[in-house]
Amino acid sequence: MKIAVIGQSLFGREVYRELLKEGHQVVGVFTIPDKNGKADPLGADAEKDGIPVFKFPRWRVKGQAIPEVVEKYKALEAELNVLPFCSQFIPMEVIDCPKHGSIIYHPSILPRHRGASAINWTLMQGDKIGGFTIFWADDGLDTGDILLQRECEVLPDDTVNTIYNRFLFPEGVKGMVEAVRLIAEGNAPRIKQATEGATYDPMQKKENAKINWDQPAEAIHNFIRGNDKVPGAWTVVGDQQLTFFGSSFISNGPAPDGQPLEIPGAFRPAVVTKTGLVLFGNDGQKLSVKNIQFEDGKMIPASQYYKTADSAALQLSDEEKKFSEEIRAAWKRILTNVSEIEDSTDFFKAGAASMDVVRLVEEVKLKCNGLQLQNEDVYMATKFEEFIQMVVRRLRGEDGEEELVVDYVEKEINNMTVKIPHQLFINGQFIDAEGGKTYDTVNPTDGTAICKVSLAQVSDIDRAVAAAKEAFENGEWGKMNPRDRGRILYRLADIMEEHQEELATIESIDSGAVYTLALKTHVGMSIQTFRYFAGWCDKIQGSTIPINQARPNRNLTFTRREPIGVCGIVIPWNYPLMMLAWKTAACLAAGNTVVLKPAQVTPLTALKFAELSVKAGIPKGVINILPGAGSLIGQRLSDHPDVRKIGFTGSTPIGKHIMKSCAVGNVKKVSLELGGKSPLIIFQDCDLDKAVRMGMSSVFFNKGENCIAAGRLFLEESIHDEFVKRVVGEVKKMKIGDPLDRSTDHGPQNHKAHLDKLIEYCQTGVKEGAKLVYGGKQVERPGFFFEPTIFTDVTDEMFIAKEESFGPIMIISKFKDGDVDEVLKRANNTEFGLASGVFTKDISKALYVSEKLQAGTVFVNTYNKTDVAAPFGGFKQSGFGKDLGEEALNEYLKTKAVTIEY
């Protein structure tokens, strides 16, 4: 189809490019005249392609079409006019001229928000749904018949830029191309616009963007974000006009600490804080703005309002002076109308536009591999000297990144001061949950509350997912070299090691883990896991594949291993930090971003980890931590359309429910590590001393709260009595007590509900006829302590033979001497298949049994010997997918095949 493209901007350029790819003939491009010697991106591209380009300053004079302009247009004989973004008024003689007429892109769901400031009004009026319309052009009042519409959710802190970049631009380009395709196929609809709900909103200009303070905080927030970046919502303080950018609504929380700032007409003084400027509505609610712009165009972080500029300019090294001149040359290439770039040259006063900001940022980033630079940084350092000082400071690591504000709960415990975050961690900040909702997390040693923890709500989950998506699609994490990503993960492991005693102490008081075990395993293996996967970051690679050639041409096929995107991770309460590390390390190494839900009863080490991740330099939005109810958070993550992968460790029933939700939703990739009833077979030819020692560890390690715990021991008859005698003797030596006591062997169970289930489990075993040899009851002391327990004479049909206790309960059954196949049949007679073990000195028997056992892990003459390099995961209803080892990366990668013909 012969098309005339009428419009301008990067959006117009992308539509033009895609139409060419579709095979359409663009017979002409009509765009705006050059500005300061620079062509509009649409016109510049078309000129390079040899397409006729027309740059009429106007199409009409005194309401009448200019005949010469119309004739030049008609000479092209276009069959369709496509107006992706057009700021000029096009006469109806041109609109109606082509065979198929004209189509226009409009960034709202018509008939709502007609007019040139549709995106602004969508946000200013707090619409929950936004989107765009492609309609058949009319006389300029946006009332033409609708061809196509697409909707998107408007996020609470969306600005004009974020909703445009996230949806209106990329999906709008696709929509324009689809609309042209429908027209070419003869299938394009013409749907009359409804009259109900129609609005025509005036254009937002600087003069009508003054903030009205006599309204609720949410309305003020919507007004500021609806004018961000153009024209900019403003107020007057003293004799200075201040324009606000980067608004976020604060739904609750305590009064902010900082310096007051009187704003005429405001409900109460604003407060300059470490994170921004807190403003108040007439309802007493709060919002915060990130940046302030002065009348001269200079922009600063709002948190710096009362601070003077750095007292002394940096003294540049010879290398930095050379770099400065290279950047000066880049400014000169952009500001072609300026004869010389002086230190005082102002980027914008010299004629730069928003597209030039993008170009400058990309040029500097190209010269400084790995430098994190954003468009807004240019607005904050508009003069050349300021810009160089800012870039050099950043290269030196003196970039003045905003300080992470943590409302710690401090505890004097374990001979140290432990500082514990307790809020949600979203987009690099600790914040309260919506409505200020909290719950108590309890110390199982004495049953007392440690602190109140924020309880995430649906809006918090959506905000976290949006932050993770933004970080993946547009943030530094997604653009970073894999080796640089690995360096950050190595740094994270180092920082975790520096804080290992504090992490282990928090783990002990929150989960009941014995401190020495927490230090070695809970925390120690977490550190090892991040180090291991840090090393994988730059070793993820595809392969080349020989395929049949399309003779006489040749073909090359190769594969790419790519990150999935936003991953939801849900972890259990038995190893709070280690389970986080097992999944998150592989996920991050693959290049994904994470929204993680720790167990509701053990959230504290995950929140401390979030704090340490900021210290390590992990960018905002890459890691998000949401404490709260699994039924709410886990369900929402499973249902959320922007989450592309769920990694879950927990019970089999919940795992099934998650898998179903992921299938019904957007067919997410899922990995599940579920329940277990791991068999441990001990033959009479074993090293009995070692078998007793490892058998006890297989059951009582970490109080039995161990996914691979030996749920059932099968003993050859000839050693049964001796084994039981020795185990009982060793159990009696175990010290039960405070997990922070270095001599303690056995700490409290994780939480009260679990303790009650263990008591009920043992009562069931006794009722069914199993012999309770030792334990079986709660320890008479404060806290959730349960005695190590031993059952014998357990037969296959009993409840305790089939169901997992997830506690310190040893279930012992006999089998006849030499009957290997029979004991294998009994061991495999379960729907679980997470782990297993065998003790024997006969290598042939060991290999035979390890082959026949239906489990993801088989331990031979050892138990619980997991390693970061060895894959971990189960069979059958114990789930699928692997943690640890190279195979874990597969859970967080997708494979793309690329075929080239040449």
From Swiss-Prot:
Keyword Phosphoprotein: yes
Amino acids binding NADP(+): 571-573, 597-600, 630-635, 650-651, 673-674, 757, 804-806
Disulfide bond residue pairs: none
Region: Hydrolase domain, residue numbers: 1-310
GO biological process: 10-formyltetrahydrofolate catabolic process; biosynthetic process; NADPH regeneration; one-carbon metabolic process
Active-site residues (renumbered): H106, E673, C707
GO cellular component: cytosol
Name of the protein in its database record: Cytosolic 10-formyltetrahydrofolate dehydrogenase
Organism: Xenopus tropicalis (Western clawed frog)
Gene name, Swiss-Prot/TrEMBL: aldh1l1
